[in-house]
Amino acid sequence: MAGPMQEKFTALTPALYDYLMAHNPLPDPVLRDLAAETAALGPISRMQIAVEQGALLTFLARVLGARRAVELGTFTGYSAVSIARGLVPDGRLLCCDLNEEWTAIARRYFARAGLAERITLRIAPAIETVRTLPRTPEIDLVFIDADKTGYRAYYEELLPRLRAGGVIGFDNVLWGGSVADPSDTSDDTIALRALNDFLVRDDRVDLVMLPVADGLTLARKR
């Protein structure tokens, strides 16, 4: 879709990104150490969310007054710590992941952040875990950052369990720009492209796609 608003954006140069980071909340020692330990893992560290995404997740949880949250795809725990810190005092976060090696790091940082009692981590296919949850609209916030081909199925399972006004966030919706490249026919790209096309037409939610990091879509249940 073309139009005069199409060019209403500011390109993020390295200097401007540094400025942006300097005017956002800085990660505390727990998150700084977690990010450093994750970076030391090598190329796999790219699976960690960006610092500004973590700040946004904490902000969202607080704005929503979230008590119950679900995360699909925990990795080393940066996003989980960010979400859990934004929950109300008696709030709880359910994390779903398959990898015990990466989540062992997450567990250490949950404890260090004083959040171990508020976060439940289940090592199992996320779709199986989600289907065990009551099919009642009790969840306030969801963050999906798992296998891309599973996003649509996760969404359909979680939406009935989300309260009206609750929010589902989808990470990597720009997929490095591949979603706008017709020649990219990889399974992940096709799945994300189809999800993006579907969500923008789904009248069950209000939607915004943000150019944050690798793209973050927020869907608010009507």
Features from the language model and the residues they span:
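A short alpha-helical cap/connector motif
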Residues: 1-141, 148-169, 173-222
